[in-house]
Amino acid sequence: MSVENVRQFFKKYHLENRIAEHENIGDTVEHAAELLKCEIKQIAKSMTFIVAENPVLIVLAGDKKVDNKKFKSTYNSRPKMIPFDQVADRIGHIPGAATPFAIKSDVKVYLDVSLKRFETVFAAGGSTNSTIELSIDELENYAHPLDWVDVGKD
């Protein structure tokens, strides 16, 4: 999938023009924050895991890492990240461009409570040089998460 898939996804909500394409690459939260001139914590970081053989995408604030104990308590398994070379096949986006939009139908999406600190966040737009700024309500509405979770390290 690509920025065009994400653009098509948002077209049905008339938000496709909010996807910004940048000259430089923002494939890490640090690069994205520098590119957008915002704080790292305002980047909606998508992390991909395998839970009970299923692909899971968790969106956290950019300044958070996954807490192994919280993850195990939430999902009844230790965190196992999807290998780098399998992310595109399992999720539908390449590493550094993963986003909860225009993903494969079997991916389970969760939003971490660390995002609730902000009015808006910047999510990847389907490529390493595209982003979309969304309010937390918009993120929740369009990402279609199964639930809010608390798996970020304090």
Predicted segments — roles?
Residues 1-154:
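Extended, low-hydrophobicity, polar/charged segments
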